[in-house]
Design a protein with these regions (language model features):
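NAD(P)H-binding glycine-rich loop region in Rossmannoid oxidoreductase-like domains
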Residues: 35, 39, 45-96
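Mid/C-terminal beta-alpha module of Rossmann-like enzyme folds, strongest
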Residues: 215, 222-269, 303
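Alpha-helical substrate-binding/gating segment
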Residues: 186-194, 202-237
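NAD(P)-dependent short-chain dehydrogenase/reductase
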Residues: 157-161, 165-168, 172-203, 246
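Catalytic helix-loop patch of NAD(P)-dependent Rossmann-fold dehydrogenases
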Residues: 91, 95, 128-168
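Conserved Rossmann-fold NAD(P)-dependent oxidoreductase catalytic core, especially the SDR/UDP-sugar
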Residues: 86-88, 97-143
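Hydrophobic ligand-binding cavity/cleft-lining segments
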Residues: 220, 280, 298, 306-356, ...
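N-terminal Rossmann NAD(P)H-binding glycine-rich loop of SDR-like oxidoreductase domains
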Residues: 3-23
C-alpha cells in the first residue's frame, strides 16, 4: 500500500515507519521540518512538508495514497499547562486532523482519494475513573484531557466523506525504549530514586510500542476494522505494580511514595497524568482477532529493560537508515580505522592497533583520544561477533567505568538500518553521575549525531 504518515518523526511514528517498510508498504512522511526529518527518520520514505494551513498543497500530497495515518500532536507531558500551552495541546491535534478531513473532502470525487483514515486519540478520553472497567462504549470523562480527546475525535468525524473508512485508536501509555513514559522514568529508576506515585493504586492503561505499531498495521490493512478501538494492553497495571516490576528489573530499591500533595505542588494541573486512573480494556480489537505480543506489565518491562548489564547505567540508542546495501555498509563499519572518519575532531581519536589481523570474537582494539584536552588510552574487546548482523564491543580500559556498545545491521528496502545501543557508567558512582553525568551524556549524544551526519554524507539516506 501507499501510505501517508503524519507525525512520522515522533516516538510512535519512527517505529511505525520501520514496520511499514518492513511489511513492504511505500511510505510518504508528512513533516513540519523536512531537512531535520531527512537526517533523523530511520526508514526510507518520500518526505513532504506538512502544512495544514495550505489545503491545496496538503490535498496534493495526500492524493494517490490508499491510507492516511495521523499521529500529529504535541507531547502532553513535556511542559507546564499554561493557557498558551493548553491551546497548543488542542490546536496541534485538532487543526491537523480537521485539515486532513478537508483535504479528503476536496478529493472525494477523485480516483486518487485515500480510502482509509486512521487517526489517534488517547485513553485520557475517559478521565479519572478509579477502578471502573472501561471499554470503547464507556462515556467520556470530565476535565482537560477528556475535552481534548472529545474535540480531537469530533474533528476526525465531522464532514468526513462516507467512502473513507475511519479508524480511531484511543492509545494508552506507550512503553518503549528511547521515548514515551519509559524514556522519562527509566533514568530515575536506574539512579535508585523511584517510588510509588501517590497511593500507587491508580490504574495505568499501557501498551508496548511493538503492540501499538502492530495494531496500527492491523487496522490499516484490515478492511473490516472501523470505528473506535482502545489501543491498550489486555491487563492494565496499577502504578504500584509498574513501580515494583521496573525497580526489580533494574536492580534498584523503591523509596517512599511521593505523596499526592507533593506531586500536585510540583506538577500543578499535570499531576492528573500520574495520579489519574484509567482501567481500559481493548475489547474491540480482541473481539475482531487482534493478538497482543505483550499482555501484562511483567512481559513488557522484561522485554524493554530486562537486560541491564549493571545497575545504575545510562543508555543511548541511535538508529539510521543508509541508502547502500548491507554488503557495502557492514564492511565499512567493521573496519576499526573508519572510526577515525566517524568521530568528531574534538576527540582527536586515533586507532593504535588491534590484537588480530581481522576482527573476531576476542579481538582487542587500542585507541588514543583527548577528552576535554586530557589524553586518554582506550582498549575495547569484541565480545560478540556475528557478521553481518551484529557485533558488540566492551571497554576493557578507558574513560568510563563501563562502556558496552551493540552494533546491529539490517537490510531494509535496498539499504541498511543501523542500530547502535550503548550502556555506560561514568566513574565515581552516584557522585560522578550527579556531577559529571549531564556533561558526559551531552558528549555521547554529540558523538553519535556527528556519526549520523558523516555516515549520511558517505552513503546517502532519505
Amino acid at each position: 500500500m501507499k501510505i501517508a504518515l503524519v507525525g512520522a518523526t515522533g516516538f510512535i511514528g519512527q517505529e511505525l515507519g520501520i514496520a511499514l517498510v518492513r511489511a513492504g508498504h511505500e511510505v510518504t512522511a508528512l513533516v513540519r521540518n523536512p531537512d531535520k526529518a531527512k537526517l533523523n527518520l530511520p526508514f526510507p520514505c518520500k518526505i513532504c512538508k506538512f502544512n495544514p494551513e495550505n489545503e491545496v498543497e496538503l490535498a496534493g500530497n495526500l492524493a494517490g495514497h490508499e491510507a492516511i495515518i495521523n499521529l500529529a500532536g504535541e507531547g502532553i507531558q513535556e511542559k507546564s499547562w499554561t493557557k498558551a500551552r493548553i491551546r497548543t495541546l488542542f490546536d496541534s491535534r485538532i487543526q491537523p486532523t480537521a485539515a486532513i478531513v478537508r483535504a479528503l473532502v476536496s478529493l472525494k470525487d477523485s480516483e486518487k482519494s485515500p480510502t482509509t483514515f486512521l487517526t489517534t486519540s488517547a485513553v485520557g478520553f475517559y478521565g479519572d475513573r478509579g477502578d471502573e472497567a472501561l471499554d470503547e462504549s464507556s462515556d467520556p470523562g470530565k476535565g482537560l484531557l477528556p475535552d481534548i480527546c472529545k474535540e480531537w475525535e469530533i474533528a476526525a468525524k465531522t464532514n468526513l466523506p462516507a467512502a473513507v473508512r475511519l479508524v480511531m485508536l484511543r492509545i494508552g501509555v506507550v512503553l518503549g525504549n528511547g521515548g514515551g513514559m519509559l524514556g522519562k522514568v527509566l533514568p530515575i529508576f536506574r539512579s535508585g530514586a523511584a517510588g510509588n506515585l501517590g497511593s500507587g493504586r491508580q490504574w495505568l492503561s499501557w501498551i508496548h510500542i511493538d503492540d501499538v505499531v502492530q495494531m496500527i498495521l492491523w487496522a490499516v490493512t484490515n478492511s473490516k476494522a472501523k470505528g473506535v478501538y482502545n489501543a491498550t494492553a489486555p491487563v492494565p497495571a496499577t502504578n504500584a505494580a509498574f513501580t515494583h516490576e521496573l525497580a526489580r528489573l533494574v536492580k534498584r530499591p523503591i523509596f517512599l511514595a511521593a505523596p499526592k500533595i507533593v506531586l500536585k505542588i510540583a506538577l500543578g494541573s499535570r499531576a492528573i497524568l500520574v495520579l489519574g486512573s484509567q482501567k481500559a480494556y481493548p475489547h474491540g480489537a480482541i473481539s475482531e482477532g487482534f493478538g497482543f505480543k505483550f499482555s501484562n506489565i511483567q512481559q513488557a518491562l522484561r522485554d524493554l529493560c530486562g537486560d541491564d548489564i549493571q545497575r545504575g547505567i545510562s543508555e543511548i540508542r541511535v538508529r539510521q537508515w543508509l541508502a547502500k546495501p548491507l554488503s557495502e555498509i557492514f564492511p565499512f563499519f567493521q573496519n576499526e580505522k573508519n572510526l577515525e572518519i566517524l568521530t568528531p575532531d574534538f576527540l582527536n581519536f586515533r586507532v593504535v592497533g588491534k590484537s588480530t589481523r581481522e576482527l573476531e570474537k576476542g579481538t582487542l582494539i587500542d585507541y588514543k583520544l583527548k577528552l576535554h584536552g586530557l589524553p586518554l588510552h582506550w582498549q575495547s574487546e569484541i565480545i560478540s561477533w556475528a557478521p553481518p548482523e551484529h557485533f558488540i564491543d566492551n571497554q576493557i580500559s578507558g574513560p568510563y567505568t563501563l562502556w558496552h556498545h551493540t552494533h546491529k545491521f539490517e537490510a531494509l528496502a535496498g539499504g541498511t538500518l543501523i542500530t547502535d545501543r550503548v550502556q555506560y557508567l561514568v566513574p565515581l558512582g552516584l557522585l560522578g553521575k550527579l556531577s559529571a553525568g549531564p556533561f558526559v551524556n551531552k558528549d555521547v549524544n554529540s558523538i553519535f549525531e556527528y556519526r549520523k551526519m558523516k555516515a549520511r554524507e558517505l552513503f546517502g539516506g532519505n
